[in-house]
């Protein structure tokens, strides 16, 4: 008789191989056909809301790994919250305006933006943005991200733009919006102002020069003849705009002798200057900074005075302690100049070229003027020293060219108007990680006014008019309401298509009586676009809520979207738009280096999805401690693939042993389960608690490690290893087998749900195979499992901790015996145990030790019994010896256990008594 046919061998149609690149698109198609998003939302209607508000990615190019990390984290959160019983809508969005899209249109379509109409250029930009929205949308969906993809929010939509105008109007009504002449970050290449969030820092080599400014009027403090104040600058091109030299009122300054001249520098810099200039610089006089206020110098090459003033921003970190001050080219210079009533001189135009005010340098680009100015200083004997330095310098975020500080008339949002309220709101928000609070707090506390105007065309226009008669700026509740109404119907293109008269209320007149108006030509900063999504999206869409429960983006958004959203929300409504803010780090390779094309260390998420599957990528996101920088490489992805295989194989093994199990009628009550089964449920309870805690605290790596370790250790290496015999060999409907199947079912059912937010495709694939699952049901509409209190038996845990420590020592002894060729398989062995007195008492209370150790027999000797020679002594259990011997009896043909009872049953002479009994009852 072939006894193999009498075994309960595992069987399932659930595939062993994931084959994810082929299978996932089929599942995705099914989701789309069934409208999984609507199905889930319907299932959670009326439940408490949880709103994660999507920070909009830029509609430009294919998605990269940073996008994948961001969107998958959001998807894990939303899917978990849904399964935790919340109504958790997710409305994805896109940021669609701004310079990067303009640049791509110019570059890829070969368009000269000055040669086509504004309306036509904007149409091209819109088409470009929409193209990449469609591309990115499909790419995000392929990652398994569930959302309202049919109705995303786009910053170019007319409803969005109208709501944005409304926020601007609220800020203007509170006098937070003003026009001012002050230095702003300016990109000469892109010909526009930039916000702080549009600046990136990179290393740059600059000229560093020390220049003599001759004293013209010493005011009785300095002598007028042959006395010079020495300044230091790394931007020689700003010297034509110099109007003052700033000292610190409390610093000590010294007059030193250099041949027949007298030079003024800060005493704190003297030693470093002696070394750098290789001069002795003997001290002639000392002054305190405030004594020198009002001394007048002559500009070294322009007929103009340069006055000595005082400022707190002067430091002794570099230079001379005498700071070259050009109010038109620096924020600190501007602020100190304002205090002294200095004019704002900016002899540089929008292309970074000197204007006529630049004198001899007119028409020259500022970077080209540097060496010319230095040469002129040499010829005038005004150059003390010239050097080159490498330093971190501000560059444009899009064209990557160095930027300049340039005073221009711009529109600003006055941060001072609502700074205090914003700082108070920061205290009310939960910041994860907690250091994010200090970061954004300091940024808001130190932030200057926000330059919100841009000299471009692809964006939302600043809704301000000018009276042609008196030049007054026109903005009121009435004009804002009219523009908002038109934009809601026609979008912001109306600003460029209609004359001013049609955009203003009918019959509108200026206070001066004027009836002719022109429109502002600047558009809003894109950070104002995305920063008003709290109104345009959260307030406007009925399925969402304001404030959002969570904003989640990269940590660079403390100065970007988190900042602009907080600023506009507090300015308009006096409250933060979010209850909590979660940030993730940046991507690095295994050596901690940032991803870059030059290093060739990037990982393409689309390629990973194509070759391995989206669930592998999602598992990597889950495994990462994403709050810090996240390491990624092909090797790490391979590790994730292996971890996935372990989890999948474990789930498949569970399924394959449940092919005849009906949870409605085959379950065994908890009280009737053997200890090993109750121990497995204890472990399931613990892993369930840990996983749910990980989701709640956004510590998803807890989820990954808990599930992976549970599959690899508690299940595969212990429980499943032990009960395999029972599952295969015991009678099909025996209580012992059904007890194990009850546990397998509970473990499978829980694990699939616990991992569903992460392994979204695999959970969906396996769910219909789970016994008792209604046809057509979705795992995504299920709720998370819970750890039943009865499972969490502390006494049982303590007992099994000891028993598993013994098992571990036995396993080591068996492995040694196998290596020594004493046995070829654990089932050929009998284990003789020589415990200490305490352990003996413990082990005598454990039935079926052979089942737990997976050997044919166990002989437990008394503690007082003499231990034989050659005994293996346990490493971690004092006084515990183990001997491995060949098991007595014959090998059972059916279960492979050696038993002295093999042959007793004449009908089945090759079987042990247990197997003979089972077979006889078939």
Curated annotation (Swiss-Prot):
Residues annotated to bind Zn(2+): 892, 895, 912, 915
Gene Ontology MF terms: aminoacyl-tRNA deacylase activity; ATP binding; isoleucine-tRNA ligase activity; tRNA binding; zinc ion binding
Cellular component GO terms, alphabetical: cytosol
Enzyme class, first EC level, given as a word: ligase
Cofactor binding mode and count: Binds 1 zinc ion per subunit.
Cofactor: Zn(2+)
GO biological process terms held by the UniProt record: isoleucyl-tRNA aminoacylation
UniProt comment concerning the protein's domains: IleRS has two distinct active sites: one for aminoacylation and one for editing. The misactivated valine is translocated from the active site to the editing site, which sterically excludes the correctly activated isoleucine. The single editing site contains two valyl binding pockets, one specific for each substrate (Val-AMP or Val-tRNA(Ile)).
Function: Catalyzes the attachment of isoleucine to tRNA(Ile). As IleRS can inadvertently accommodate and process structurally similar amino acids such as valine, to avoid such errors it has two additional distinct tRNA(Ile)-dependent editing activities. One activity is designated as 'pretransfer' editing and involves the hydrolysis of activated Val-AMP. The other activity is designated 'posttransfer' editing and involves deacylation of mischarged Val-tRNA(Ile).
Name assigned to this protein: Isoleucine--tRNA ligase
């Amino acid at each position: 008789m072939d006894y193999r046919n009498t075994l309960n061998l595992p069987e399932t149609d659930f595939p062993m191989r994931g084959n994810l690149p082929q299978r996932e698109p089929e599942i995705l198609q099914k989701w789309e056909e069934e409208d999984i998003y609507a199905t889930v939302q319907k299932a959670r209607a009326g439940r408490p809301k949880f709103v994660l508000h999507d920070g909009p990615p830029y509609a430009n190019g294919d998605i990269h790994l940073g996008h994948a990390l961001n969107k998958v984290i959001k998807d894990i959160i939303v899917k978990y919250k849904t399964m935790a019983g919340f109504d958790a809508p997710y409305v994805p969005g896109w940021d669609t305006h701004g310079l990067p899209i303009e640049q791509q249109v110019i570059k890829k379509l070969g368009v000269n933006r000055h040669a086509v109409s504004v309306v036509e250029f904007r149409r091209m930009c819109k088409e470009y943005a929409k193209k990449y929205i469609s591309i990115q949308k499909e790419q995000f969906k392929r990652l398994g991200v569930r959302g309202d993809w049919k109705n995303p929010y786009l910053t170019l939509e007319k409803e969005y733009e109208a709501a944005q105008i409304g926020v601007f109007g609220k800020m203007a009504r509170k006098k937070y919006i003003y026009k001012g002449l002050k230095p702003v970050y300016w990109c000469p290449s892109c010909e526009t102002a930039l916000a702080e969030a549009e600046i990136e820092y990179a290393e740059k080599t600059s000229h560093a020069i020390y220049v003599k400014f001759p004293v013209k009027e010493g005011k009785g403090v300095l002598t007028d003849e042959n006395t010079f104040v020495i300044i230091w600058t790394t931007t020689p091109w700003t010297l034509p705009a110099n109007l003052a030299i700033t000292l610190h009122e409390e610093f000590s300054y010294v007059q030193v002798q250099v041949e027949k001249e007298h030079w003024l520098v800060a005493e704190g810099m003297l030693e470093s200057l002696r070394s750098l200039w290789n001069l002795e610089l003997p001290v002639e006089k000392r002054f305190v900074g405030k004594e020198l206020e009002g001394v007048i110098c002559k500009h070294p090459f322009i007929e103009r005075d340069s006055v000595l003033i005082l400022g707190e921003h002067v430091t002794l970190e570099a230079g001379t302690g005498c700071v070259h001050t050009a109010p038109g080219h620096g924020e600190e210079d501007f602020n100190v100049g304002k205090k002294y009533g200095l004019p704002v001189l900016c002899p540089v135009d929008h292309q970074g070229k000197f204007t006529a005010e630049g004198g001899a340098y007119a028409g020259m680009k500022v970077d080209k003027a540097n060496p010319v100015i230095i040469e002129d200083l040499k010829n005038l004997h005004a150059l003390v020293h010239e050097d080159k330095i490498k330093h971190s310098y501000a560059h444009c975020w899009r064209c990557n060219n160095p930027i300049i500080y340039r005073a221009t008339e711009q529109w600003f949002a006055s941060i001072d108007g609502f700074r205090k309220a914003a700082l108070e709101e920061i205290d009310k928000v939960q910041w994860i990680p907690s250091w994010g609070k200090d970061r954004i707090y300091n940024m808001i506390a130190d932030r200057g006014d926000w330059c919100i105007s841009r000299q471009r065309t692809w964006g939302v226009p600043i809704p301000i008019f000018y009276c042609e008669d008196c030049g007054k700026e026109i903005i009121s509740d009435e004009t804002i309401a009219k523009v908002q109404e038109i934009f809601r119907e026609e979008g912001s293109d109306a600003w460029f298509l209609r004359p001013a008269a049609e955009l203003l209320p009918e019959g509108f007149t200026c206070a001066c009586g004027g009836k002719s108006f022109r429109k502002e030509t600047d558009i809003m900063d894109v950070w104002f676009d995305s920063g008003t999504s709290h109104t345009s999206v959260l307030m406007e869409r009925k399925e969402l809520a304001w404030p959002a429960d969570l904003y989640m983006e990269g940590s660079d958004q403390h100065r970007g979207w988190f900042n602009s959203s907080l600023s506009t929300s507090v300015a308009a409504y006096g409250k933060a738009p979010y209850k909590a803010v979660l940030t993730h780090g940046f991507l690095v390779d295994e050596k901690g280096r940032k991803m870059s094309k030059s290093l060739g260390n990037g990982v393409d998420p689309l390629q990973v999805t194509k070759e391995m599957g989206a669930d592998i990528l999602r598992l990597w996101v889950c495994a990462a401690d994403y709050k810090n920088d996240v390491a990624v490489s092909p090797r790490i992805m391979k590790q994730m693939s292996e971890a996935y295989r372990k989890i999948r194989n474990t789930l498949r093994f569970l399924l394959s042993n449940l092919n005849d199990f009906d949870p409605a009628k085959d379950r065994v009550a908890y009280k009737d389960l053997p200890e090993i089964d109750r121990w497995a449920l204890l472990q399931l309870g613990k892993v369930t608690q840990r996983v749910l805690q990980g989701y709640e605290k956004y510590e998803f790596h807890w989820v990954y490690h808990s599930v992976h370790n549970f599959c690899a250790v508690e299940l595969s290496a212990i429980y499943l290893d032990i009960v395999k015999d029972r599952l295969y060999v015991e009678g099909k409907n025996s209580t012992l087998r059904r007890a194990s199947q009850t546990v397998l079912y509970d473990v499978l059912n829980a694990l699939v749900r616990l991992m569903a937010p992460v392994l979204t495709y695999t959970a969906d694939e396996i769910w219909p195979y789970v016994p008792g699952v209604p046809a057509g049901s979705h795992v995504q509409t299920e709720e998370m499992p819970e750890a039943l209190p009865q499972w969490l038996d502390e006494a049982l845990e303590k007992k099994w901790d000891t028993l598993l420590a013994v098992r571990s020592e036995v396993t080591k002894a068996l492995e040694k015996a196998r290596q020594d060729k004493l046995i070829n398989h654990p089932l050929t062995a009998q284990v003789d145990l020589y415990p200490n007195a305490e352990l003996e008492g413990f082990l005598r209370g454990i039935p079926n030790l052979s089942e737990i150790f997976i050997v044919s027999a166990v002989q437990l000797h008394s503690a007082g019994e003499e231990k034989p020679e050659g005994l293996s002594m346990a490493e971690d259990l004092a006084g515990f010896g183990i001997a491995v011997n060949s098991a007595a009896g014959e090998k059972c043909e059916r279960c492979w256990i050696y038993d002295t009872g093999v042959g007793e049953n004449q009908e089945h002479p090759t079987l042990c008594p247990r197997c003979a009994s089972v077979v006889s009852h078939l």
